[in-house]
Amino acid sequence: MADLRKAARGRECQVRIPGVCNGNPETSVLAHIRLTGLCGTGTKPPDLIATIACSACHDEIDRRTHFVDAGYAKECALEGMARTQVIWLKEGVIKA
Protein backbone atom coordinates (compact mmCIF):
# COMPACT_ATOMS: atom_id res chain seq x y z
CA MET A 1 0.00 0.00 0.00
CA ALA A 2 1.09 3.58 -0.61
CA ASP A 3 2.58 5.61 2.22
CA LEU A 4 -0.57 7.51 3.19
CA ARG A 5 1.29 9.65 5.70
CA LYS A 6 3.48 11.02 2.91
CA ALA A 7 0.48 11.30 0.56
CA ALA A 8 -1.28 13.59 3.06
CA ARG A 9 1.47 16.19 3.31
CA GLY A 10 0.92 19.49 1.55
CA ARG A 11 -2.75 18.76 0.78
CA GLU A 12 -5.91 20.75 1.39
CA CYS A 13 -7.48 19.97 4.77
CA GLN A 14 -10.46 17.64 4.40
CA VAL A 15 -11.75 18.08 7.98
CA ARG A 16 -12.60 21.78 7.54
CA ILE A 17 -13.99 22.57 11.00
CA PRO A 18 -15.61 26.03 10.68
CA GLY A 19 -13.79 28.63 12.76
CA VAL A 20 -10.93 26.22 13.47
CA CYS A 21 -9.41 25.20 10.11
CA ASN A 22 -6.33 27.26 9.26
CA GLY A 23 -6.60 26.45 5.53
CA ASN A 24 -2.82 26.04 5.27
CA PRO A 25 -1.82 22.95 3.27
CA GLU A 26 1.76 23.35 4.51
CA THR A 27 0.54 22.14 7.93
CA SER A 28 -1.47 19.17 6.63
CA VAL A 29 -0.73 15.66 7.87
CA LEU A 30 -2.49 12.32 8.10
CA ALA A 31 -4.67 12.53 11.23
CA HIS A 32 -5.84 9.20 12.61
CA ILE A 33 -9.42 8.97 13.83
CA ARG A 34 -9.72 7.44 17.27
CA LEU A 35 -12.48 4.82 17.38
CA THR A 36 -13.26 2.40 20.20
CA GLY A 37 -11.71 -0.99 19.50
CA LEU A 38 -9.23 0.33 16.93
CA CYS A 39 -6.87 2.20 19.20
CA GLY A 40 -5.72 2.61 22.74
CA THR A 41 -2.91 4.06 24.77
CA GLY A 42 0.05 4.31 22.42
CA THR A 43 -1.81 2.50 19.62
CA LYS A 44 -3.07 4.26 16.49
CA PRO A 45 -5.73 2.92 14.14
CA PRO A 46 -4.69 1.75 10.64
CA ASP A 47 -3.71 4.52 8.22
CA LEU A 48 -6.96 4.05 6.25
CA ILE A 49 -8.87 5.22 9.33
CA ALA A 50 -7.53 8.74 8.97
CA THR A 51 -8.01 12.00 7.14
CA ILE A 52 -5.93 14.79 5.66
CA ALA A 53 -6.04 17.52 8.32
CA CYS A 54 -4.40 20.88 8.84
CA SER A 55 -2.62 21.34 12.16
CA ALA A 56 -5.55 23.23 13.71
CA CYS A 57 -8.18 20.63 12.75
CA HIS A 58 -5.79 17.85 13.82
CA ASP A 59 -5.44 19.46 17.25
CA GLU A 60 -9.21 19.71 17.53
CA ILE A 61 -10.02 16.12 16.52
CA ASP A 62 -7.29 14.84 18.87
CA ARG A 63 -8.78 17.13 21.58
CA ARG A 64 -5.60 19.07 22.26
CA THR A 65 -7.90 22.08 21.74
CA HIS A 66 -11.59 22.37 22.58
CA PHE A 67 -13.09 25.04 20.32
CA VAL A 68 -16.01 22.81 19.27
CA ASP A 69 -17.96 19.96 20.85
CA ALA A 70 -16.15 16.60 20.75
CA GLY A 71 -19.03 14.96 18.87
CA TYR A 72 -18.97 17.64 16.18
CA ALA A 73 -15.19 17.35 15.86
CA LYS A 74 -15.54 13.58 15.35
CA GLU A 75 -18.31 14.13 12.77
CA CYS A 76 -16.05 16.51 10.83
CA ALA A 77 -13.19 14.00 11.05
CA LEU A 78 -15.35 11.16 9.70
CA GLU A 79 -16.58 13.35 6.83
CA GLY A 80 -12.94 14.27 6.17
CA MET A 81 -12.00 10.58 6.10
CA ALA A 82 -14.65 9.96 3.44
CA ARG A 83 -13.41 12.91 1.34
CA THR A 84 -9.79 11.76 1.78
CA GLN A 85 -10.59 8.23 0.63
CA VAL A 86 -12.45 9.51 -2.45
CA ILE A 87 -9.42 11.66 -3.38
CA TRP A 88 -7.05 8.71 -2.98
CA LEU A 89 -9.34 6.35 -4.93
CA LYS A 90 -9.47 8.83 -7.84
CA GLU A 91 -5.68 9.20 -7.77
CA GLY A 92 -5.07 5.46 -7.50
CA VAL A 93 -3.32 5.83 -4.14
CA ILE A 94 -5.73 3.22 -2.71
CA LYS A 95 -7.94 0.66 -4.44
CA ALA A 96 -11.56 -0.25 -3.79
Swiss-Prot record:
Gene3D superfamilies: prophage-derive protein ybcO. Coiled coil: none annotated. The active site is at 32 (proton acceptor). It is an enzyme of class 3 (hydrolase). Keywords: Hydrolase, Metal-binding, Nuclease, Zinc. The keyword Nuclease applies. GO terms for molecular function: metal ion binding; nuclease activity. Based on its fold and a conserved His residue, has been predicted to be a nuclease. Encoded by the cryptic lambdoid prophage DLP12. This is Putative nuclease YbcO. It comes from Escherichia coli (strain K12). The lineage of its organism: Bacteria, Pseudomonadati, Pseudomonadota, Gammaproteobacteria, Enterobacterales. The gene is ybcO.
